Amino acid sequence: MKDGFLKAAAAAPKIRVADPAWNALEICKALDSCYAQRAKLIVLPELCLTGYTCQDLFLQERLLEESLEGLQTVLEHTKGHDALTFVGLPFEKDGKLYNVAAAVQDGRILGLVPKQNIPNYGEFYDCLLYTSPSP
């Protein structure tokens, strides 16, 4: 931090739909670029570990498991770095599916932030898949 400011970065890695392992490697490449520029806050796209357009594939346990494995790859990559990073992925808890941003830093998950406003208009059918967290 310099003069009360920190360097923030928005990274947009290449993404393959329903390929969390490949996406995790691309995310790690993007993080390296952010680390090289000394970013202390890094945000990645919504559902970047799976791609946004998986539709019914989000209901497959295999994709959810692979996205957690991809998150583990990213976690390992963040070890030794103090940048607070937000990584998007689907997350299932108690039979409910959430669209979350995982807050990670130095190899640790600090928390999961579920998407609050689930759209239900136009081309968005997120409400058919995701649960909005209770207030």
Model-derived features with residue positions:
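Cys-nucleophile CN-hydrolase/nitrilase-fold catalytic domain and related Cys-dependent amidase chemistry
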Residues: 33-121, 125-128
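Conserved small/polar residues in nucleotide/adenosyl-binding loops
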Residues: 130-135
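N-terminal glycine-/serine-/threonine-rich phosphate-binding loop
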Residues: 1-41
